Amino acid sequence: MKNKKDKTQKPKVIDEKFVAFFKSLNIEPQNWQFYEDAFVHSSYVNENEDARASYDRLEFLGDALIDFIVAKKLFELYPNYNEGMLTRTKIEIVKGENLNRIGKELNFGNFIKLGKGMPYTETLFGDVLEALVAAIYEDLGIEKANQFVEEHIFKKTYSEILKYNFFSLFQEQKLPEPRVRVSLTSNNLVLSIIELNGDIIWSQAVPNSKHYDDKSVLEHNAMSAFTQFLKSGKGINFFSDIKNKLDSQKPMRALTVRPKKINWKARKPKLKALKNKVKADS
């Protein structure tokens, strides 16, 4: 007697849209059964005898895989982060609302199989995303699973990660929340300022080589530049100096990062004029 639940059984027919979907994800399945299982809800299995399995077990494995891959990526990217910051950043990336959103953006709803009357809840998309990562791992190995997580989870949450990390840097030092200001000059420079309690603690003026004019993009770039500055080692005593000056209640002198190959004698704005310019444009 043929066992309908035989785990080596291959699906007889693979939907063309399902094949095209994986091609769009740059995935070439070797064993399609893993991927079919990843999109089957337990309610569908209960109502259909031909259904092999639900995504429950794959979801369990995928949850652990995503945690591991993201943790490893953060460990490599942020050597100066302590255990607490690494943990909080990982939680921010893999939280359910992010996974649910990504699953919806990838149009998982076109392929999820549910029992009759079962609604499409938000958490379904995140569950299937976790199951899909496990399916990729089981079929193609950790390298391909790592590639998928980095491309579709890590990169898609990078802006949120950067913003979270930027403000966490100050929270970790028990400093007030900083303010980021950006402005464009007539000679195509991007002026970026970070303020603390109204004092400028860091500023940067760089050519707007990509001609960005979106304020959110410019602020994102400013936070990224500041974070990279700290990672470079140049800012090793940055926060301790800031805290000492706050404790002594002395005016803080801004640290300015200058670009190369710019005639600063002709272009260098005075700090006061720079601050007024940004305030006027904000």
From Swiss-Prot:
Gene Ontology MF: a single term: metal ion binding
Q: Which SUPFAM superfamilies match?
A: RNase III domain-like
Q: Which GO terms describe its cellular component?
A: cytoplasm
Annotated localization = Cytoplasm
BP GO annotations: mRNA processing; rRNA processing; tRNA processing
Q: Where is the RNase III domain?
A: 18-141
Q: What class of enzyme is it?
A: hydrolase
**What cofactor does its activity depend on?**
Mg(2+)
The organism that produces this protein has a lineage beginning with: Bacteria, Bacillati, Mycoplasmatota, Mycoplasmoidales, Mycoplasmoidaceae
Binding, Mg(2+):
59, 127, 130
Its annotated function is as follows: Digests double-stranded RNA. Involved in the processing of primary rRNA transcript to yield the immediate precursors to the large and small rRNAs (23S and 16S). Processes some mRNAs, and tRNAs when they are encoded in the rRNA operon. Processes pre-crRNA and tracrRNA of type II CRISPR loci if present in the organism.
Q: How does it assemble?
A: Homodimer.
Reactions it catalyzes: Endonucleolytic cleavage to 5'-phosphomonoester
tRNA processing: is it a keyword of this entry?
A: yes
Could you identify this protein by its name? Answer: Ribonuclease 3
Q: Which family does it belong to?
A: Belongs to the ribonuclease III family.
Gene source species: Mycoplasma pneumoniae (strain ATCC 29342 / M129 / Subtype 1)
One matching Pfam family is Ribonucleas_3_3
Primary gene name: rnc
What Enzyme Commission number(s) apply to this enzyme? 3.1.26.3
Task: Give the annotated active site.
Answer: 63, 130
Q: Which UniProt keywords apply?
A: Cytoplasm, Endonuclease, Hydrolase, Magnesium, Metal-binding, mRNA processing, Nuclease, rRNA processing, tRNA processing
